[in-house]
């Protein structure tokens, strides 16, 4: 699986403008990602778009959704939803340092806005991410509802 994920970090020729439908590499996305905490009481989920400063700004859910869309699915909504519905990819809720956190699992590997790299579950647990006993798979329907609410509240 590590070799399969390594291809997502290879250079992609052409423009580094990240709106492009073809997606981008993990390195490209990470270079343009900037953490932004949701305002209190507004937990909105988005696949992040470039802002005026040329950055992707969002929190842990936004990072996970955006890596899935831009890096893994290379800009394909069909593949994005297929991977979520078939549980080949999932957003995983965990507790960390006294708060909630979301990481992306794709195959046997995990990534979040702390690691910014594909790592094994044990590596996530070493960071303090507590998956057990209340490991929470965030269902695709929940993802869809949260993203729709994000659009409405936008």
Would you name each region that the model predicts?
Residues 1-154:
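A structural boundary/capping signal
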């Amino acid at each position: 699986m590590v070799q399969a994920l390594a291809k997502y970090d290879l250079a992609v020729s052409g423009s580094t403008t990240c709106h492009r439908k073809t997606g981008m590499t993990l390195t490209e996305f990470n270079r343009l990602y900037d953490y932004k905490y949701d305002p209190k009481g507004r937990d909105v989920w988005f696949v992040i778009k470039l802002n005026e400063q040329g950055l992707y700004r969002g929190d842990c859910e936004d990072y996970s959704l955006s890596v899935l869309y831009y890096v893994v699915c290379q800009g394909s909504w069909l593949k994005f939803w297929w991977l979520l519905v078939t549980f080949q990819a999932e957003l995983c809720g965990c507790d960390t340092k006294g708060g909630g956190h979301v990481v992306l699992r794709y195959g046997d590997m995990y990534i979040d806005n702390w690691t910014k790299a594909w790592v094994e579950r044990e590596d996530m647990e070493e960071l303090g991410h507590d998956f057990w006993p209340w490991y929470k798979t965030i269902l695709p329907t929940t993802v869809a509802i949260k993203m729709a609410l994000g659009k409405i509240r936008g």
